[in-house]
C-alpha cells in the first residue's frame, strides 16, 4: 500500500485487509509506504506481526531528523514517529528508511543513515525528488537537473506480478496510473499487450514515457544501501 491518496496507516480497515490478503495467499509479499506518524504503538506492533515473511516490508518516509523532518512531512510528531518505528521493528519485521534530500536536510544524510542503522532498519535510501519543489523548499546545493536517458522497458509490474488498487477500490495494473483518473484503466490485458509494442497504451506512455519499445528514466538516487 502506498499513499497516492492519503497514508495507508490512516485506513480504518488496513490491518484487516492485510490479514485478508495473507489468508488468500500465504506466500504473498506485503508492503506499505508511510510517514509513520499515524496510529499508536500497539497498531504498529500488530502490523509487524502480520509482516512476518522475509520479503514483507514497511518504507518509512523520514526526511531528516527531529529538527527538519517536519518541514516537508507537515504535522509529523518526531517522538510519536520514533515510538511507532521502534514498536514495528521490535517484532523483527523489515523496515526501510526513505529520505528525500533538500537544501535544509542535505547535511543530515550521514546522521540519518547512522540512526537508521541504530534503530534496526534493514535499508536506507536517500534520494533527490524530481517533483516540483514547493515554496520554501530548496534543492540541495549539489543538485543538478537529472539527465533523461532512453533504455529498454523493464516493467516493474510485470516483474512483481502485482496490481494496483486505488483508494476508491478500482483495480489497475500499476500505481503510476493512479493519478490519471480521467483515463483510469481496469483492463490489465489491454495494458500488457501494449508494453512492448510500437504503439504503447496512451496512459502508460504519459506516465512512463514509453515509446517504440523504450522508456525514459532518470537517475535520482543519491545513496541506497542495505544495512543488514
Language model features by range: what are they?
Residues 162:
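Short hydrophobic/aromatic beta-strand element in the GNAT-like acyltransferase core
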Residues 1-3, 10-115, 119-127:
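Radical SAM/AdoMet-radical enzyme domain recognition
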Residues 156-159:
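Short, small/polar residue-rich loop motifs at catalytic or cofactor-binding pockets
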Residues 165-166:
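Short, acidic, Ser/Thr-enriched surface-loop or helix-capping motifs
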Residues 134-150, 197-204:
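Short, positively charged
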